[in-house]
Amino acid sequence: MNFIVLSSSRGTVFKAVLERIADRSLTAKCLGLISNREDHGCVTHAREAGLPIRIIPHTKGEDREAYDKKIHAAILDLMENKKPTTCVLACMGWMFLFSPWFVSIWKNQILNIHPSLLPKHPGAHAHALVLAAKETESGMTIHLIDEGLDTGTILVQKKCSVYPDDTVETLKARVQKLECEWYPKVLQIYPSACT
């Protein structure tokens, strides 16, 4: 299976995925990275791995569908004539909602990772929301993207404890450990993970 990474983050999970490819425990092939800024850590990881990179800047107030059409063109470029049905879009810290147009084109082919046990605490600042709610457990969710905000079909959820003295940083570290372990596993078995 082929996948393209969409990331606008430091790339912690992306780096873990690349390490699993390097040690051959993940046999899926990464065709490249799409990011919105050159200075993100994910771009550094892609560059070090020798992967093609496409930077698609996002301007404040830009129409979602117009931006998604640029993303779509970059995806097709990275696919180099491969059939769209042989490729998954793996969002790893992608901080933009997709338009209904984009979701309809890539239906059931867009994976996302979220740092909470959805449907609890969707959207940004999940760790802070978990702590504010005084939850005793948190975790991560890998799900398909649909038209909503973190509402798509859940593929995998893994839990971890939340301790009374946790901070956003300590909880984030614990959840990221789960994310780094499980995203490569889902990429290895997808699409059978949802059948």
Give the positions of each predicted feature:
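N-terminal beta1-alpha1 ligand-phosphate binding loop
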Residues: M1-T44
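Short phosphate-binding loop-to-helix
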Residues: T59-K82, V88-F96
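Donor/substrate-binding cores of folate-linked one-carbon enzymes
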Residues: R20, A49, T86, A90-T195
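Active-site catalytic pocket residues across diverse enzymes, especially alpha/beta-hydrolases
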Residues: I21-S25, M79, K134
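Conserved nucleotide-sugar phosphate-binding/catalytic loop shared by glycosyltransferases and other
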Residues: H40-G61
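Short hydrophobic/aromatic-enriched beta-strand-loop microsegments
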Residues: K29-L31, P52-P57, Q109-H114
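Membrane-interface segments of envelope glycosyltransferases acting on lipid-linked substrates or membrane lipids
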Residues: M1-I4, K15, L31, K69, ...
